[in-house]
């Protein structure tokens, strides 16, 4: 049986705020709302997640997007913008002492965002963009690269090589589903050990994996009810981390509402996932 056995460790953050990702150790969590909506909203979500993860002994990397650049509709809300988001991320780190993650879309953003953000995320649609990968790698920050929905898991060896050969060994490979016909994604759990075999900690994105791209005509749909199903399966296989977007009112969130987990449901979900994780890594 092929298993997720490489014990390579990648650590995000500085000093006491460090969070490690390793396929053979307890999973760490990347969580937060899809997009950064306001300072107050970011602090509210962050406070709840920090308290929860501290109580459960889970390492937390707080995530949020300053710009949702690939919205289905031109009128879709995209976020509060780069400058405002960097100020808020800096204040979140001071207040809560956790590393933060945000996605980047252009080479020019890499140097700016890396001054504050600990983990730079490469969106799935941009996972083969060489110039972006090289620019991100050269910042020296941890890179979380989403596997494109159009890529096989073994194709990520080329993505990983671009980052490593640009001088950055601190790479996380993230599974977020594969295209399966129109408006549908499926999660092939074989991809988790396959990507681990390439030499990187593996993250499973449990919320984007249940997206239905463009499934609501002018916006993306999702099947929130299957987040737990897929997360449990991934943890049973064994992963270094889970990526879960969450919101206190997902049905009215400005983006990705149909696939985000309700904030009030996070405690029970994480407790269940920890139980599976303990068995898998015993």
Curated annotation (Swiss-Prot):
One of its GO terms (molecular function) is 3-deoxy-8-phosphooctulonate synthase activity. Its main location: cytoplasm. Pathway: Carbohydrate biosynthesis; 3-deoxy-D-manno-octulosonate biosynthesis; 3-deoxy-D-manno-octulosonate from D-ribulose 5-phosphate: step 2/3; Bacterial outer membrane biogenesis; lipopolysaccharide biosynthesis. It catalyses: D-arabinose 5-phosphate + phosphoenolpyruvate + H2O = 3-deoxy-alpha-D-manno-2-octulosonate-8-phosphate + phosphate. It is found in: Cytoplasm. GO terms for cellular component: cytoplasm. Keywords: Cytoplasm, Lipopolysaccharide biosynthesis, Transferase. Belongs to the KdsA family. This is 2-dehydro-3-deoxyphosphooctonate aldolase. It comes from Agrobacterium fabrum (strain C58 / ATCC 33970). The gene is kdsA.
């Amino acid at each position: 049986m092929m298993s997720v056995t490489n014990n390579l460790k990648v650590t995000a953050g500085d000093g006491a705020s460090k969070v490690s990702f390793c396929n053979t150790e307890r999973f760490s969590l990347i969580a937060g709302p899809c997009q950064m909506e306001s300072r107050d909203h970011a602090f509210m979500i962050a406070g709840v997640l920090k308290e929860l993860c501290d109580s459960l002994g889970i390492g937390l990397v707080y995530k949020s997007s300053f710009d949702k650049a690939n919205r289905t509709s031109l009128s879709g809300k995209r976020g509060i913008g780069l400058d405002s988001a960097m100020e808020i991320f800096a204040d979140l780190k001071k207040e809560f002492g956790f590393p933060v993650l945000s996605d980047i879309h252009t080479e020019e953003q890499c140097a700016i965002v890396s001054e504050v953000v600990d983990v730079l995320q490469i969106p799935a649609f941009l996972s083969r963009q060489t110039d972006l990968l090289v620019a991100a790698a050269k910042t020296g920050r941890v890179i979380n690269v989403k596997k494109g929905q159009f890529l096989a898991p073994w194709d990520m060896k080329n993505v990983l090589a671009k980052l490593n050969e640009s001088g950055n060994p601190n790479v996380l490979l993230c599974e977020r589903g594969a295209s399966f016909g129109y408006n549908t994604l499926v999660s092939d759990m074989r991809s988790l050990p396959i990507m681990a075999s390439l030499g990187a900690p593996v993250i499973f994105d449990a919320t984007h994996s249940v997206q239905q791209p463009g499934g609501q005509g002018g916006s993306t749909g999702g099947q929130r009810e299957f987040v737990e199903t897929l997360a449990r399966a991934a943890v049973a296989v064994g992963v270094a981390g889970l990526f879960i977007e969450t919101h206190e009112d997902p049905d009215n969130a400005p983006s990705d509402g149909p696939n985000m987990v309700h904030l009030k449901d996070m405690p029970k979900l994480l407790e269940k996932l920890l139980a599976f994780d303990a068995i898998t890594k015993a």
